[in-house]
Amino acid sequence: MTQYTPMIQQYLKVKADYQDAFLFFRLGDFYEMFFEDAVKAAHELEITLTSRDGGSSERIPMCGVPYHAAKNYIEQLVEKGYKVAVCEQVEDPKTAKGVVRREVVQLITPGTMMEGRTIDEKENNFLAALTHFEDGSYALACNDLTTGQNTVTLLTGSVEDILLEVYATGSKEIVVDSSFSKDELNKLTETLKMTISYEDATAIPEGLEHLVKNVSQAKLIKAVGRLFNYVIRTQKRSLDHLQPVEIYYTNQFMKIDVHSKRNLELTETLRTKEKTGSLLWLLDKTKTAMGGRMLKQWMERPLIQKERIEERLEMVETFVNDYFLREDLKEKLKEVYDLERLAGKVAFGNVNARDLLQLRRSLLQVPAILEAISLLDNAYAARLIQGADPCESLTELLGRSIQENPPLSIKDGDIIKDGYNDKLDQYRYVSKNGKTWIAELEKRERDITGIKSLKIGYNRIFGYYIEVTKANLGALPEGRYERKQTLANAERFITDELKEKETLILEAEEKIVQLEYDLFTALREEVKVFIPKLQHLAKVISELDVLQSFATVSEEEQFVKPVLTTKREIFIKDGRHPVVEKVLNGKLYVPNDCIMPENMDVFLITGPNMSGKSTYMRQLALVTVMSQIGCFVPATEAVLPVFDQIFTRIGAADDLISGQSTFMVEMLEAKNAIANASERSLILFDEIGRGTSTYDGMALAQAIIEHIHDQIGAKTLFSTHYHELTVLEDSLDQLKNVHVSAIEENGKVVFLHKIQDGAADKSYGIHVAQLAELPDSLIARAKEVLAQLEGQEEIVIPKRVEVKAQEQEVIPEPIVVKEEPIEIEETKVDNEEESQLSFFGAEQSSKKQAKPALDAKETAVLTQIKKIDLLDMTPLEAMNELYRLQKKLKKG
């Protein structure tokens, strides 16, 4: 390192502490980058890569950006997942001895960005910290530096479950300790696409202990400590806006995994990943940025406490019934800026005068808002605004201190009002009168010299001067002025009197700018005292904003207040899919009932492709979510239970599980539901089994239906193309067949989109192909093939039978299918009547079949089958075992 110049040595020393970040190294009016940083930054930012002499034999790669434009370049890098360490000159170059001292003043990362285009006003920007414990549990702490919000929770379960909870926070960066395994880190980076950062310190930093007073579990404190230590280490400044840590537990809210959230398009659409077209898009009528953020948080975690849901619903009902109250509230909310993020900027020290002006305008609306809500006869409303301080003294302070149209910069003056500070008023008097004197001097000199073009000007190099054109130099009295500068067409002069006034004016202006800056920073410190009150106000206003948003959309879309019941029953009259109905934009939407009494758990849905089966299923889920976040629902009447979880298998494979086939994804999501669902859950399965052969798919579909029906008892909508499964209605007393109706007119299919009792007679797949405008020749051939297939023997689904066991359980008799003659190696088995292949048993059910000779491999498999205890296996386990044995038979 000694071969480099002192400045490059300084750079390398600083860079050694920030190996995973771009180092923006301040040199005069530029931030420079060197070596590998320069090469990479030039590529990412599309700026010129150059080089400089650094004292070594080879020139050093270099690139740079102007300091006044650095913010834009930093945002570009952070948006791409990089970190940027900002290294400033921390001493005056004029007084420095040797190399100017430089220090990193801030490390900017995806999870610690405070402002810029990467920060959506209606999105939180969470930084996550994950701590792994020896017992297999994890603690997850999150911080939004822009608002000061802090949360923590304890997580148990599989690594995949943990990752999905991390993903649900929307964090762009996650902090872990250096002992995290490579496998765990790979899942974080590859699966969740997050920036990884490291922090080993877990003790709560000094001065922040008050933020964890309500946290007693050591595991949670460790996670919060890791988070706080990282934030302090990277930001290197006051964090007075950090709020007390909120503990939440996942079992306090309805669980909806990421797959289901995506399938249901709660906050973004499945295809475009955009808000437009999602349920959030429909429900978001909030007027404030902080209200928008709270709405999304509510949608991420619907409630499961009946009383809390009903409180919200009652407030929404109040706003729905009182149009004038709602409209007046909306008008006031329009004038309220983002109090949470304004408070964060105050604490962070990057608030400007315009921000404080916005704060004042916001606070002016608060007294009227609080008064209007206080007049409501509603316990929830009274509790909500309890302790809310309108901060009227702060409003008054800002009103007499900040100019109405201040500049963006706090270093250019013209921020503070006249009358706020006596000394500032004195300086302004001198400056103002001095300039008046300059104007009077110019007029006087014109009169004395008779030169009408004579003027007095100013520049930073020469100060004030008298300018006379060369054509008028002869008219000047001898010795009146002292020559200062010669121009091509004029001469500039000064006088002793002019220089004296200049000194007074410039000193006053310089002192004005400095004093205004000092007064503003002092004012900022006074505002800091109000941060806790502002944050409390922000929560109150955010909640009111979300509730009025629910009321507004409920009124506009003619939603109805749901009735919550402790019974396991669903009664939805004329239910609609809220987003589809909105997108239809006035076109007739066909509503559908969903009536499932306590003794009805499963709807087996059949019907044509494109008829609306998936829409009907999503509709029920969205109605449920809307109900449990406290919103009215799209129906004419709705009685609903409180669901603890929603599981879905709808639509295309989710890209979170990469490298898996559609069928494997189906099975994984089915497993998730079967393993975790309770009788208080809602399960939506669309076309389970489509990713494998017909027989395998049908067998699995039946096994899953029976397991849900017999073992779980969850309310379930199960759509299928396996029409043979509709006979299950005869053997499963809590299953009901329903179908989406369609009719044929003049050879064309007409989808009625209406749910009716009973099973569908056909799927109309070829008609859908015609709608897709497949070639006529292809359609004709498909009809020929269909006619041939329909002439063959059909698949038979037998009734369930009782099997005597120690506890007389009822288990399903094997699914059986009509088949052509079965060939096992060289031995043929001919069907005289029926030949049935058992999926759960070992014997052929047709007694008239000839018994084939078995080879050694088949005998071994048969022996294994005889040893299987079906009563001790789930249907899925039985299918897996059958699949293994089948593969064994096929080998060789």
Curated annotation (Swiss-Prot):
InterPro entries documented for this protein: DNA_mismatch_repair_MutS, DNA_mismatch_repair_MutS-lik_N, DNA_mismatch_repair_MutS/MSH, DNA_mismatch_repair_MutS_C, DNA_mismatch_repair_MutS_clamp, DNA_mismatch_repair_MutS_core, DNA_mismatch_repair_MutS_N, DNA_mismatch_repair_MutS_sf
GO cellular component terms listed in the entry, alphabetical order: cytosol
Residues where ATP binds: 607-614
Source organism superkingdom: Bacteria
CDD domains xrefs: ABC_MutS1
UniProt KW keywords: ATP-binding, DNA damage, DNA repair, DNA-binding, Nucleotide-binding
Xref: Gene3D superfamilies: 1.10.1420.10, DNA repair protein MutS, domain I (3.40.1170.10), MutS, connector domain (3.30.420.110), P-loop containing nucleotide triphosphate hydrolases (3.40.50.300)
GO terms assigned for molecular function: ATP binding; ATP-dependent DNA damage sensor activity; damaged DNA binding; mismatched DNA binding
Entry-linked SMART domains: MUTSac (SM00534), MUTSd (SM00533)
Pfam families: MutS_I (PF01624), MutS_II (PF05188), MutS_III (PF05192), MutS_IV (PF05190), MutS_V (PF00488)
Biological process according to GO: mismatch repair
Family matches, as PANTHER family: DNA MISMATCH REPAIR PROTEIN MSH1, MITOCHONDRIAL (PTHR11361:SF34), DNA MISMATCH REPAIR PROTEIN MUTS FAMILY MEMBER (PTHR11361)
Function of the molecule: This protein is involved in the repair of mismatches in DNA. It is possible that it carries out the mismatch recognition step. This protein has a weak ATPase activity.
Family: Belongs to the DNA mismatch repair MutS family.
Name the record gives this protein: DNA mismatch repair protein MutS
Organism in which the protein naturally occurs: Bacillus cereus (strain AH820)
This protein's encoding gene: mutS
